[in-house]
Design a protein with these regions (language model features):
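Boundary at the C-terminal end of the N-terminal hydrophobic targeting segment
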Residues: 19-25, 32
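Acidic/His/Gly-enriched intrinsically disordered linker/tail segments
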Residues: 314-322, 327-408, 424, 442-445
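Beta/coil-rich, acidic/histidine-enriched accessory regions frequently appended to metallopeptidases
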Residues: 26-28, 441-481
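Non-catalytic architectural context of zinc metalloproteases
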Residues: 31, 44, 74, 79-88, ...
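Bacterial N-terminal signal peptides
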Residues: 7-19
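Early extracytoplasmic/domain-onset interaction patches
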Residues: 28-72
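Juxtacatalytic substrate-recognition/specificity segment
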Residues: 210-333, 339
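Positively charged n-region of N-terminal signal peptides that target proteins for export
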Residues: 1-4
C-alpha cells in the first residue's frame, strides 16, 4: 500500500464512519439425574496464594464421576494446563469417609462414588489451587486481594456443564465482593449461574478495591479498581459511559442487566479479557495520563467492551458451548478479535474520545505494522486464526517471517470490508449492518454462525459478490493494495 493513497482514502471516508478427549478411557456420564452442584470458595490465608475449593455434588447415582479441570480459558487460545496448580485433592462421602479416586488423565480426577443400584449419593470434593500468576487469563491471590478467572479454579463434573450451579465466597472481614454473578434470593450469600459456562465466564474481584458505579440506559455499571494510578474517577465513569452508549446505539440496546469492569492497576501488567457481562482490564499506574497513554487504555476498554457482542454473543459455532479439555478451533478469529480492534477504535471516534487525527494516526500505524511483517505473504487471516493455539501466544524469533497476527490483519480486513460495503451500496450499508445481521439472526437466537455462511452474510447485506475478496484477502495472502 502507498502511504499517501491510504491517508487520502482514510481521510475521505472517516466522516461517513461517524454516522452511523479423554486419552485413557471413556469417561462415565453424569447425565442420568439432575445434580446439585455447589461450590464454596475460601481463602483463609491469602498470603499463601492458595484458594480452598469445596465442591458438593448431590444426587449422584453413577458409580463413578469424572471431575475435570479446564485446560484453557475462553478468549485466550492456548493450552494453559490449569490442573498443574491443583493440590491436596480429596473426595468424601456423606459420612466424611474417603472415597477412592485416581487420575484418568492430566486434568481428570475419577471418583468412585459408592452409589449402587441407582441410589443417590452426595460427594464432597476438596482441593487447593495455587494462584500467584497475575494476568487476565489466570487467578491471583495475595494479602491485598483475590481475583479469580473461574476456568483456572473450578472443576466441573463431566457431562453436567449445562446444569445450574451455586457459589458461596467466604471472604475475609472487610473485603467486598464484586462479581457479575447474581445472588440467589434468600440464599444466605450464594451466587447462582444457569450453567458452568456462565460460572467461569464471571471473573470476580474480592478485596478493599475502589468501586465506582454509574447507570446508563437504566442498567447498572460497576468499575472495580485494584491498585493505585493517576486516574480521575469522574472522568473514568464519564468516558466508560460514552463507550457503552456507542455500543447501545449500534446494536439498539444493551443485552444485560448489569455490567462489570474489573481494572487491575500494577506495574508490569497489561491486556484484557472479555466475558459474558464483564471484562478484566490490566494496565500500568501511569496509563491514565498523558493523553497518549490514556488513549491506549481507552482503546483496550473499547475493544473488550465491544466483545460483549462480537465473540461473546456473535460467535463462530465452534466457540460455544465450550470443550474445556481440548482446543476449540475456528478460522474466524480475524473477525472476532481483529474486527473488535477495528470497532474499538471506531467507537472511541464516534464517542468523541478520539480525534480524527488520532484515529488516522492509529490506523496508519496498524497498516505499517502489517506491511513490516513478512509473514503476511505466507499466512492468511483464516490460517492465523486456526493456528492461534500454536502460534498466536507462542511467538519466537521466526514468527514475523512465518506468521501474521489475526488482530492486526483482522483490523485491516474490518476496515476494508467496511469500505467495500459502503462503496458497493452507495453509502446505504456498512459493516455495522453486517454485525447487526449476525446479532439478530444468530446471537439473539443463542447460536453461533457456521463459518461457511459468513461470506454469504456479507453478500446478503451488500447485495454483491464477495467471493473474490474472501479468496484473496481472508483465505488467501494477496497483497492489500
Amino acid at each position: 500500500m502507498k502511504r499517501t493513497f491510504l491517508s487520502l482514502m482514510l481521510t475521505c471516508w472517516l466522516a461517513s464512519l461517524l454516522a452511523a478427549g479423554n486419552a485413557t478411557a471413556r469417561p462415565p456420564e453424569a447425565r442420568a439425574a439432575t445434580l446439585s452442584l455447589v461450590y464454596t470458595l475460601s481463602f483463609s490465608q491469602p498470603h499463601t496464594h492458595l484458594y480452598e475449593v469445596a465442591f458438593t455434588i448431590g444426587n449422584v447415582n453413577a458409580p463413578q464421576i469424572d471431575l475435570v479441570m479446564p485446560t484453557w480459558t475462553p478468549g485466550s487460545y492456548l493450552q494453559r494446563e490449569f490442573a498443574r496448580n491443583v493440590q491436596e485433592f480429596a473426595a468424601l462421602d456423606e459420612s466424611s469417609r474417603p472415597l477412592r479416586w485416581e487420575k484418568a488423565n492430566k486434568a481428570t480426577w475419577r471418583v468412585e462414588t459408592g452409589s449402587a443400584n441407582g441410589r443417590a449419593r452426595t460427594v464432597y470434593v476438596r482441593y487447593l489451587v495455587y494462584a500467584n500468576e497475575l494476568s487476565v487469563r489466570t487467578s491471583h491471590l495475595d494479602a491485598s486481594h483475590a481475583y479469580f478467572n473461574g476456568a483456572s479454579v473450578f472443576m466441573f463434573v463431566k457431562g453436567a456443564t449445562d446444569q445450574p450451579v451455586k457459589l458461596k465466597i467466604n471472604a475475609p472481614a472487610g473485603w467486598r465482593i464484586t462479581t457479575p454473578l447474581a445472588l440467589a434470593p434468600g440464599s444466605d450469600g450464594f451466587y447462582t449461574a444457569p450453567n458452568y459456562d456462565v460460572l467461569v465466564d464471571s471473573p470476580t474481584e474480592v478485596g478493599t478495591h475502589r468501586l465506582l458505579e454509574f447507570d446508563h440506559r437504566g442498567k447498572r455499571h460497576r468499575i472495580a479498581i485494584w491498585g493505585e494510578g493517576n486516574f480521575d474517577e469522574a472522568r473514568l465513569k464519564e468516558d466508560f459511559a460514552k463507550i457503552v452508549e456507542q455500543g447501545a446505539l449500534m446494536f439498539g440496546g444493551l443485552p444485560y442487566d448489569h455490567y462489570t469492569f474489573i481494572v487491575h492497576v500494577q506495574q508490569g501488567i497489561g491486556g484484557g479479557l472479555e466475558h459474558l457481562n464483564s471484562t478484566t482490564l490490566q494496565t500500568r499506574p501511569d496509563a491514565f495520563s498523558p493523553r497518549k497513554h490514556y488513549l491506549g487504555f481507552l482503546l483496550l476498554t473499547s475493544h473488550e467492551y465491544f466483545h460483549l457482542w462480537n465473540v461473546k454473543r456473535i460467535r463462530p459455532k465452534s466457540l460455544g458451548p465450550f470443550d474445556y479439555e481440548n482446543e476449540n478451533y475456528t478460522r474466524a478469529l480475524w473477525l472476532s478479535e481483529g474486527t473488535s480492534d477495528y470497532y474499538g477504535r471506531l467507537l472511541l471516534r464516534r464517542a468523541g474520545l478520539m480525534t480524527s487525527a488520532e484515529y488516522l494516526e492509529n490506523m496508519v500505524a496498524e497498516i505499517a505494522r502489517y506491511e513490516q511483517t513478512p509473514g503476511r505473504k505466507v499466512m492468511s487471516a483464516e490460517s492465523a486464526s486456526f493456528n492461534a493455539w500454536i502460534k498466536g501466544y507462542r511467538p519466537d524469533e521466526n514468527s514475523p517471517n512465518s506468521a501474521i497476527d489475526y488482530y492486526n490483519k483482522g483490523d485491516l480486513l474490518g476496515w476494508m470490508l467496511d469500505f467495500e460495503i459502503r462503496s458497493r451500496t452507495g453509502g446505504k450499508k456498512s459493516l455495522d449492518d453486517v454485525m447487526r445481521y449476525l446479532d439478530e439472526n444468530y446471537a439473539q437466537r443463542g447460536v453461533g454462525f457456521p463459518e461457511e455462511e459468513l461470506k454469504g452474510v456479507f453478500e446478503k447485506v451488500a447485495g454483491a459478490d464477495f467471493t473474490d475478496f474472501f479468496r484473496r484477502y481472508v483465505s488467501g495472502t494477496d497483497e492489500i493494495d
